[in-house]
């Protein structure tokens, strides 16, 4: 099936040329291209058109789980008839295993898995292995982390066909081999039940049941059933049932792995003893021996991922399988906000290695733990045959990799221009800022102020409040949901000024903001680099009166570069508007959607743009960005699941945990009422 792009808008401004250039580059096999698109120019809409033109499976890689959810919503609206999938970390909470030698502290792994995201991850891998070409997977950096062998996953796919001879008990054994669990009492995701000649399977990657009816040893009917109402939704002549887990293995592989682990354990224990590390040798022997007993008896153990090399049949030092292995050879990778995403991909391996070094050196884990890891950057590059880097401020790496193939997109469909930038002395900067704020308040516009430190942000906020200016601050110490609430209240007019540090850069979409003030703009460093200044200035680009004031006592190279580039873009935008008779239009957006979703309109760059994305720190389902894209039945199931968890916690007398689930339940019910009444 081919990609079918659904949108009431047509490419305008720089978009047609950008689409043509990028499409031509991909079809000609160009390994790397860069889309340099300013804020609000409709970069997502451009990429959607490129995907439609090339008709290849595509991975959209984002550096942030919340932005990934936003992009997922956008591409879902562009391609409603194609497979648009979502693949991010499925942990609501994750505390990795670690050892701190300085204090002799061992920290056990602790986690909570989000069932809804686990389902979406399985749906993504199932779509990729189905053989269809029209697949878009929106992913965070989780796509470079180790997972099961795609061959093992595919070998456990169960193909059934109406009229085919198949012994029912053989079918049930195959379901168990695919890690489905029989439960005739309560059917949950990943379970199946048997009633006579009818087998109901709650698919691990779907919201619906698959009902397989037998007549003797022949498959009589294959139906998709609504799990709540029992209504038949669809009938199939043939169907592929994908496994219930991404990590597949066989009994033979398991026994072989245990034998190899025990052989290597003997060698590693002997090595510790030779070095005189008797305590470490004893610890390693006891821990691994216990793990092997658990695997023999139960089929799993805590930390089994540290033995993944043995189960996969990989040699020491070889890279793990990851999501990229599930794609065909000719797929495309689009790296969004590449100036942030690429360094993140590069850093993942080093951080993982540093943590595990202590675990291995002190006998908590075998050396095989090193092979349960994210990809090294060089390994990622080998798998990424064709890449489009997308950023308003691409880094030197992307520019070098693209070898000069830079596709520029600076014209906004709204006709809005890049903001005017002024440089003012830092002497009396707060008094000057106060005057500017008062002017914006009179016009009912908003102001963003960026400082260098959290303390400066808090102190400036206190000063402004003492002077009767309604303001608040956001930085990394402010809770995720509270940050979202504060920024939405800024749009609603509860505050006139928002003060922040580094959260006012990529992706913050506040059309009411007409002034961005950058304090200490001449303090060269990460927060005042050319790219940071350009991204920060871009927050004023969605208002027709957009203006940026840099307070500084000298002109740094970063400031000069930012100002020169902004002026160049303004001239090009002005010339285009004059040539085509375009009058800039102020963006109007529904305030309650400021930070909670997206649609094709804004992606096309017509009236809106990308939204704030802030990594969720709460471990509640209500805080997860994917909730906003749930259908009504999905939301009902999530509410019911949360209610069960609350009741189970109460039965165990875990009242604090029960209260947390109760609060989450109330939030989900409120969201349900807001959306569907």
Regions found by a protein language model. Give the residues of each.
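Pre-Walker A (Motif I) flank of P-loop NTPase domains
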Residues: 27-34, 56-57, 133-135, 445-446
């Amino acid at each position: 099936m081919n990609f079918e792009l659904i949108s009431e808008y047509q490419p305008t401004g720089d978009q047609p040329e950008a689409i043509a250039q990028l499409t031509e580059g991909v079809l000609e096999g160009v390994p790397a291209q860069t889309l340099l698109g300013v804020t609000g120019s409709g970069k997502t809409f451009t990429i959607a058109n490129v995907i439609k033109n090339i008709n290849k499976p595509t991975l959209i890689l984002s550096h942030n789980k919340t932005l990934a959810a936003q992009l997922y919503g956008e591409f879902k609206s562009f391609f409603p008839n194609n497979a648009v999938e979502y693949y991010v970390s499925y942990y609501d909470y994750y505390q990795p295993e670690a050892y701190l030698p300085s204090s002799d502290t061992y920290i056990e792994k602790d986690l909570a898995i989000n069932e809804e995201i686990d389902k979406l991850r399985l749906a993504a891998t199932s779509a990729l292995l189905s053989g269809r070409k029209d697949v878009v997977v929106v992913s965070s950096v989780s796509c470079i982390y180790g997972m099961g062998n795609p061959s093992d996953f595919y070998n456990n796919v169960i193909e059934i066909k109406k009229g085919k001879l198949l012994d029912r008990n053989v079918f049930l054994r195959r379901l168990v081999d695919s890690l489905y669990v029989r439960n005739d009492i309560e059917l949950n995701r990943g379970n199946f039940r048997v009633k006579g000649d009818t087998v109901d399977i709650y698919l691990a990657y779907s919201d619906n049941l698959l009902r397989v009816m037998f007549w003797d040893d022949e498959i009589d009917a294959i139906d998709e059933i609504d799990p709540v109402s029992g209504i038949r939704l669809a009938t199939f002549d043939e169907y592929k049932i994908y496994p219930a887990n991404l990590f597949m293995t066989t009994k033979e592989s398991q026994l072989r792995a245990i034998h190899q682990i025990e052989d290597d354990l003997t060698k590693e224990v002997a090595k510790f003893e030779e070095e005189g590390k008797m305590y470490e040798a004893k610890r390693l022997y006891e821990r691994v021996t216990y793990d092997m007993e658990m695997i023999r008896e139960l089929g799993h153990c805590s930390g089994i991922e540290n033995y993944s090399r043995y189960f996969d049949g990989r040699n020491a030092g070889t890279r793990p399988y990851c999501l990229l292995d599930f794609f065909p050879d000719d797929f495309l990778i689009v790296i969004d906000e590449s100036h942030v995403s690429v360094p993140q991909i590069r850093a993942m391996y080093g951080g993982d290695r540093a943590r595990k070094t202590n675990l291995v050196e002190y006998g908590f884990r075998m050396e095989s733990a090193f092979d349960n890891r994210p990809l090294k950057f060089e390994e990622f590059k080998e798998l990424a045959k064709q890449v489009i880097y997308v950023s308003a401020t691409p880094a030197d790496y992307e520019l070098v990799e693209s070898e000069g193939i830079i596709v520029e997109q600076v014209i906004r469909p709204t006709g809005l221009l890049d903001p005017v930038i002024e440089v003012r002395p830092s002497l009396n900067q707060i008094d000057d800022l106060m005057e500017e704020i008062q002017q914006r308040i009179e016009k009912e516009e908003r102001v963003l102020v960026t400082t260098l430190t959290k303390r400066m942000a808090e102190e400036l906020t206190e000063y402004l409040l003492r002077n009767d200016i309604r303001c608040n601050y956001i930085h990394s110490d402010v809770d995720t949901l509270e940050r979202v609430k504060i920024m939405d209240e800024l749009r609603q007019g509860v505050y006139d000024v928002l003060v922040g540090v580094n959260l006012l850069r990529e992706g913050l979409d506040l059309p009411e903001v007409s002034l961005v003030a950058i304090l200490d703009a001449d303090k060269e460093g990460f927060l005042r680099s050319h790219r940071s200044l350009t991204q920060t200035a871009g927050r004023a680009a969605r208002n027709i009166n957009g203006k940026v004031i840099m307070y500084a006592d000298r002109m740094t190279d970063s400031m000069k570069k930012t100002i020169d580039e902004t002026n160049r873009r303004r001239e090009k935008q002005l010339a285009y508007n004059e040539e085509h008779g375009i009058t800039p239009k102020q963006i109007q957006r529904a305030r309650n959607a400021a930070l909670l979703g997206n649609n094709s309109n804004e992606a096309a760059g017509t009236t809106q743009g990308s939204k704030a994305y802030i990594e969720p720190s709460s471990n509640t389902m209500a805080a997860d960005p994917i909730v906003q894209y749930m259908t009504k039945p999905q939301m009902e199931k999530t509410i019911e699941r949360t209610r069960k968890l609350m009741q189970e916690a109460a039965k165990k007398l875990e009242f604090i945990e029960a209260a947390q689930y109760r609060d989450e339940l109330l939030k989900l019910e409120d969201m349900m009422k807001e959306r569907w009444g």
